[in-house]
Amino acid sequence: MHSFDGPGRTRPLLRRAALLGAALLAVTAAAPQASAATSGADRGPSGGGLSAVIRYTENGIPHILAQDYAHLGFGTGWAQAADQACVLADGFVTVAGERSRWFGADAATDGSLSSASKNLTSDLYFKGVREAGTVEKLLAAPAPAGPTRDLKELMRGWAAGYNAWLAQNKITDPACKGAAWVRPVSAVDVAARAFAVSVIGGQGRAVDDIAAAQPPARAASLAAGPTTGPTTGPATDPAAAAEAARAFFDTGRYDMGSNAVAFGGSTTANGHGLLLGNPHYPWQGGRRFWQSQQTIPGELNVSGGSLLGTPVVNIGFNEKVAWSHTVATGTPVNLHQLTLDPADPTAYLVDGKPEKMTRRQVSVQVTGGGSPVTRTQWWTRYGPVVTGLGPGLPLPWTAGTAYALNDPNAANLRGSDTALAIGRARSVTGIQDALKRTQGLPWVNTIAADSAGGTLFTQSQVLPRITDELAARCSTPLGRATYPASGLAVLDGARGDCALGSDPDAVQPGVFGPGKAPTLRDAPYAENSNDSAWLANAETPVTGYERIWGTLATPRSLRTRGAVEDVSAMAARGGLTVADLQKQQFANRVPAGDLAAADAAKACAALPGGVATASDGRPVDVSGACAVLAGWDRSADTGSRGALFFDRFWRKLTASTPAKDLWLVPFSAADPVRTPRTLNQAAPGIGRALADTVAELGAAGIAPDAPLGEHQFVVRGGQRLPVPGGTEALGVWNKIEAPWNAAAGGYPEVVHGSSHIQAVGWDGGRCPVARTLLTYGQSSNPNSPHYADQTRLFSQERWVTSRFCERDILASPQLEVVWPRERR
């Protein structure tokens, strides 16, 4: 099952190997813990190299047992490579800046580690990071500003484990079998991947615009370089700029989101807390989760999901606490508008004194050999010069003005330290303390519960220290448009008094300290679905934060509204158990349907002759759709008839009809969960959306009342697996996003959505009560037995019972134990 070449493979002697693992547990528990200074090769049982004991249970979930952090990293790197060698290797090509060399300069990236549109711009960015020594400098910084010794040992061990697996096994995944770009890595490579994840919401989103930035004369002659759009537009139109900035930072536009809810002891059956975590992440590529349990006896014992390439558990649980993250609304960057030296467009003025930009010349090797492609990047005291934030917000570099991007997470390599510290916490107070000490989360909220019944919501993310006062005092005209709309500050870079400053409790300059983070402690429930902190608990709104953290008293998404309705009702009902969390995950209620389907059916029935006019002007008989809408059960279960029709109809209607014309009752901050509501049956877009949907499905041979699962599915091993859940537009908790492909039968592949799901509680015993599900399985290798096993469970709305305690691990009927070791 788990390829291993050598004496560590123990399947023929399974029980003996199980006892070996138990013995190692007993020995290391009794022995004093290795210090960071003495942990490493001289302590391994393999004659000088690192090693670990890995016990695999059902669905290929590894329980990694090690004596210190280096050995734990080794076991984790080994086990990740066994499941995801090709995806990991692809990511290491990215952070090395070598995609153009292996895959072609003009080919599109997979978007896992940046938003670069082409391999060339990706390489120019990451090669520039590498040649500047950015990651090495961050690694050298002393903790807490830099990574701890424990984390460095984990990264060193992870690289050694990954390399050992590659050296001792043959890759069977066709994605990279025999590929020359699969190569050994170093601890710096592991850290470089962590850096990419840290900046993915900031510099990583602006990679094309960093590559495109050239002084005016040079930009005019660099026809072969990447471009980001016109040099006129929203930058000179305040309303358009505000909308472009809002859209650029809208969490709903990107392929990451999440739901999570923590319930306090007053709402549960036994007084212990409960946590349901449901991150919405990509199903393919380098931002997949991967499950494991990591154990250093007496030091660490944590189970959960890790982002690929990460040596720690990012979301999960231990004996006392459970936590998850949701993508936050904080704007992780700001711009500084530069006033340029009239004599030199590569110099800018600060308090009247010119400062030269730093010129970084970066060369990238491309396929076919020959001369490398060389470009120049321009950096300032604030960060890199950019020519826009996506095509919608051009920021032209003229003779008098340029724009620099400040991303404080480019100085943050602490994310894995935060995860490690949370994994060692014993209460939600301990989690809060871990966040305060490490301050490593770049773009997520934290929701947590503990065995004592405590709950926590906090938006403890690394953000530029942009106060509303600073924005009011220092915003340029562009910033006065973008900051209220999106939290994107554009500050006057020519004024020294517009520097960001520091908070006394911040571990790096220019960011907010954790004391400023929106936080809610010990509420009966704390929930987030990627809106701002305001309605983490609708009965106790969170207020008082600066605009850069998110909005207050503004409309919530349908997913937030539906989630708050559900979890507040659950909390009011009380007596909750893990089983209630499982029911919530797969309730598949469609809030948009509850709000609009009945009125849409009435509007349909009122159409003269049952005919509506489509977008192309053709009359379409929609009479058959009226009964489908009326009879639909308002769910996104695989057997639901009408869910597919409503989904296609609702997308078309909301894309063409502004909210002010769609609802009769507008949004009210006094009633934010229930407004806006009451569909305007007279809205002209309803008939058109009905006609377009009937025509679309008819052309594809799909009946209006076709069950959702017949047309929302994935194919694994030649088997079609129906997929439950619904889209962001529908507001479904169990979010599923799939590209529409009528020729292939509807939605034939999920691109992102529910991923590492966990429902966790406690019953007073030593072992947490946990059910988990990794929707896409542990492995991307179609030859692996764990390529689709959990996808089948997801299709059937079934769960994996977690094995956390030692007796449960050893009792697994599918137990397989391996003892990988480093060969020297």
Where in the sequence are the language-model features?
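Hydrophobic alpha-helical segments
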Residues: L441-M570, F649, L653, P666
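Substrate-recognition/specificity elements adjacent to catalytic centers across diverse enzyme folds
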Residues: G40-L274, P279-G285, I296-E299, S303-S306, ...
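Secretory targeting and sorting signals
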Residues: M1-T38
